[in-house]
């Protein structure tokens, strides 16, 4: 198939998290500035080279978080997105009114259908509503020998509201976290996983090290739920490297889906073959840019702008 692309304007500056397909074309466009013709030949022989990622998460009917946010994030990074739906939520920018879990059989069937057919480069997990689903997901990850997993342990919201029951939380801690290449808890989730209170940067660092001891190969404790400048500070620990990652604080109320977007961006970067720490750095920068172009839709908290101006 012959695809012809005409460029009508210069690509805005965006370095760290620029997706590979945009970056590759941008290098050509930058040399010619405007109205260049780019021809790209795509054949079936190239299909196996297309990076593929999977999201195992819930659906957000309002389109701001969950698999909707994940798939948009994958698309931005030019990664083909696949999905395993774990629950269906009725929600909008103002809140959640209903949650229905998918059956374990459905979750299993979705996962196996994709895994036996495609070469998945990375997987992220999001909302796993109950103990049974968490166990099924963990069992299938082990059965397929898949290790490139980003675990977003969706247990507590950034406002401190518990989202799953205590039994599911324990299963998340004991069964799924040890399978994570990268675990990405927010403040309140990190408090549960690390069994400690978190009020300072030093607490975040200690929590990251404690969660690492649960078996995760690396941990990113997010500033979500923290106050002041710490809202834009995350802490990374991988057993050797303890890093503080800080970006500018974006003044917006429209932050719905931020955590989903971050973990999806990390997974996309892993699928592109980037090392874990680099994948996290670029994902964090991507989310910062997306927050600058957050969408003021609905009557409440809108989502981040996944496709900020390109």
Regions found by a protein language model. Give the residues of each.
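Short pre-catalytic strand/loop immediately N-terminal to key active-site residues, enriched for Gly-Thr
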Residues: 56-62, 243-256
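Phosphate-handling active-site elements
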Residues: 77-82, 269-283
């Amino acid at each position: 198939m012959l695809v012809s692309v005409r460029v009508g304007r210069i690509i805005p500056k965006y370095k760290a998290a620029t997706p590979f397909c945009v970056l590759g074309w941008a290098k050509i466009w930058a040399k010619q500035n405007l109205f260049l013709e780019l021809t790209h030949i795509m054949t079936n022989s190239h299909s196996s080279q297309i990076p593929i990622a999977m999201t195992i998460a819930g659906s957000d009917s309002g389109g701001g978080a969950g698999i909707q946010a994940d798939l948009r994030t994958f698309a931005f990074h030019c990664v083909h997105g696949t999905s395993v739906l774990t629950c269906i939520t009725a929600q909008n920018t103002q809140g959640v009114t209903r949650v229905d879990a998918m059956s374990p059989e459905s979750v299993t069937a979705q996962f196996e259908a994709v895994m036996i057919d495609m070469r998945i480069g990375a997987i992220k997990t999001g909302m796993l509503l109950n103990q049974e689903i968490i166990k099924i997901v963990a069992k299938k990850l082990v059965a397929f020998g898949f290790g490139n997993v980003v675990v977003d342990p969706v247990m507590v919201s950034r406002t401190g509201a518990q989202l799953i029951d205590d039994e599911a939380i324990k299963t998340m801690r004991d069964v799924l976290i040890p399978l994570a290449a990268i675990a990405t808890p927010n403040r309140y989730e990190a408090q549960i996983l690390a069994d400690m209170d978190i009020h300072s940067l030093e607490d975040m660092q200690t929590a990251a090290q404690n969660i690492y001891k649960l078996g995760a190969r690396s941990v990113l404790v997010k500033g979500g739920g923290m106050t002041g400048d710490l809202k834009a500070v995350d802490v990374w620990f991988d057993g050797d490297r303890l890093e503080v990652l800080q970006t500018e604080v974006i003044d917006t109320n429209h932050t719905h889906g931020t955590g989903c977007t971050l973990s999806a961006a990390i997974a996309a970067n892993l699928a592109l073959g980037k090392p874990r720490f680099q994948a996290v750095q670029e994902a964090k920068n991507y989310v910062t840019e997306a927050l600058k172009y957050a969408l003021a839709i609905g009557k409440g908290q809108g989502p981040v702008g996944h496709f900020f101006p390109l």
